[in-house]
């Protein structure tokens, strides 16, 4: 079992690691995109301990809600629980460390299909009021959505940042420069997260240099601001996208069943008609002169 101070130290250390280069930050965002329901600090610690994790939950949730047992010897992922007056550790386990028992379930993880992209694009246009020129394809729409989220909440995201820059590379920058770089870095980070979770390749649109200013956020005190902002904005958008994808997937499944039933019905009617025709031929062949004078 880990100690509280050990995990606090891990968070501090890993913050300096993922902010040390654009590539390290992008690797972190890949994990954050899969675990978008978690807040930044949890995403940070999960990435530090299990960067390939896909679905994490507590032992109780796996056992009681999903009827999945945690594998013997599996090591829990230690997170900081600050919901109580005194900070303590809590543990989650990745789905790879579990197995189903009788009645066990696998959590639903939505996947956007290529054939669903146009429908999602139209949905984003409607929800975020995107203009047609900003939504030529899904990638454009996700970038426009990222920009929308930043402009709507920038002051809230930045609130307090300038008070904790001491000892970081941000300390030497003017407030206007910090604001401008923060806006740009946050927009690109949100887009990367959205695109990654939607199955697009962010690097078809972006390049590593888009994240060059992440190196200015070289301590947990300042990285928390860009991390929290990215996490909160991405979660808001991805929760909505997930619900939309789930809904249209169910509609497609229902339509597929209806089409299948209709095909079976038509096939059945065809077989009945063919059977009647065959019976008529048999009768005609068996009694060819019955009605002849």
Language model segments and positions:
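N-terminal accessory/interface modules of nucleic-acid-binding and processing proteins
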Residues: 1-293
């Amino acid at each position: 079992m880990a100690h509280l101070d050990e995990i606090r130290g891990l968070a501090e250390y890993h913050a300096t690691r993922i902010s040390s280069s654009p590539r390290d930050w992008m690797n972190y965002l890949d994990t954050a995109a899969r675990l978008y329901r978690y807040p930044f600090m949890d995403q940070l610690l999960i990435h530090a301990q299990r960067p390939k994790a896909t679905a994490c939950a507590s032992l109780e949730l796996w056992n009681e809600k999903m009827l999945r047992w945690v594998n013997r010897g599996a090591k829990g992922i230690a997170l900081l629980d600050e919901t109580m007056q005194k900070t303590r550790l809590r543990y989650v386990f990745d789905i790879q460390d579990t197995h189903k028992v009788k009645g066990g379930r696998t959590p639903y993880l939505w996947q956007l299909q290529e054939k669903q992209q146009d429908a999602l694009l139209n949905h984003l246009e409607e929800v975020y009021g995107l203009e047609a020129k900003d939504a030529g394809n899904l990638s454009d729409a996700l970038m426009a959505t990222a920009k929308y989220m930043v402009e709507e909440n920038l002051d809230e995201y930045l609130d307090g940042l300038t008070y904790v820059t001491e000892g970081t590379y941000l300390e030497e920058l003017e407030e206007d420069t910090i604001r401008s770089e923060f806006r740009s870095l946050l927009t690109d980070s949100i887009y990367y997260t959205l695109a990654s979770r939607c199955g697009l390749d962010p690097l078809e649109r972006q390049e590593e240099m888009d994240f060059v200013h992440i190196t200015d956020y070289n301590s947990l005190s300042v990285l928390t601001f860009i991390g929290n902002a990215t996490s909160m904005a991405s979660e808001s958008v991805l929760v909505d996208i997930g619900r939309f994808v789930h809904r249209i997937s169910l509609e497609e499944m229902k339509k597929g069943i209806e089409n299948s039933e209709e095909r079976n019905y038509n096939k059945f009617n065809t077989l009945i008609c063919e059977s009647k025709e065959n019976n008529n031929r048999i009768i005609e062949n068996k009694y060819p002169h019955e009605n002849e004078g």
